[in-house]
Amino acid sequence: MWNDEIIRKATADERLTVSHMALLFAIITLCRRENGYKSIQTSRKILMAKSHIGSLPTYHKCLKELVSLKYVNYFPSYNPKLGSRIQIRE
């Protein structure tokens, strides 16, 4: 299954911190709840709560680095009622 592969890859990657892992696992958990889709539409508030990240700078840093390390794609939504779309990369 695709999420097992991403988990294996992430746990072997020494560049990722606990915060990166928590955010990535929160994204994977939400994807699993969406019937296994690799893409979710969610808000920063939900991801911060699920990953137990309490700091905005930490959240933004981790998300930016997960994008640059090619773990996820991020498509921001500038509509406060719509969440941003996050897609797990293969």
Language-model regions, residue ranges each:
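Short recognition helix of helix-turn-helix/winged-helix DNA-binding domains
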Residues: M1-K50, S68, K81
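The DNA-contacting recognition helix of HTH DNA-binding domains
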Residues: R44, S55-L56
